[in-house]
């Protein structure tokens, strides 16, 4: 988390794993649909990309963006989860609550989302001031395809912490609901805060996908191309952005440029999403 410390609940226990990077890169440049399967679904969705994403969808009016409290200049320095639980419930009950949060984190890591949601709903009913509970519950709903519920919890996380750390996921929840004005507003917040290159990259991909969903492929391509150059030492977020950009080139009819970028991604990670299939399809 972008706050001081993380208590005994370590982020790696429940972070969305490398799969989320693949899911974001191969999904967020195309119209969204609810998801319940795992890697097999990722491969099949990617294989359908050309048929599903070639034509931009007809532009439509998006609901007006929510009125949000402006973010502070930097994320708030909040106490860790164990401190907040003990303040709310006392030492003994607070310790038990922390144990339940850790249990939910393990369930999330194991992709037992129903179990994680059940535990977290019990916790959030008792207290709504523990950021880790709101954050993890929002991620659980996101992975279950519960876009409205996920957005609700991640909006609460944003307001409580002043953090943009989950803005890409929150924006993706709104994109799934075709609330494009909210996607745009969150992208501006994330871009201006610029917390890290990986987070900004993920937010950029979601924002570009939302623009493309409205049939504005040229604008989406422009957003993905802005300040892009091939890095000498690519990291995972560079591969995600290159994949998304290549996908957008293909959708825009620029097959040679798409093939060039897909080939570059494959050269650095042959198992990234369905990139090998994408290269073959453009050969």
Walk through the language-model features, giving the residues of each:
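Alpha-helical segment of the N-proximal tetratricopeptide repeat
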Residues: 87-136, 142
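TPR/TPR-like (Sel1-like) alpha-helical repeat modules
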Residues: 160-164, 192-193, 221-229, 250-273, ...
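Generic helix N-cap/helix-start motif at coil->alpha-helix transitions
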Residues: 58-64, 92-100, 126-134, 161-169, ...
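Solenoid-like repeat scaffolds
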Residues: 86-93, 121-128, 155-162, 189-197, ...
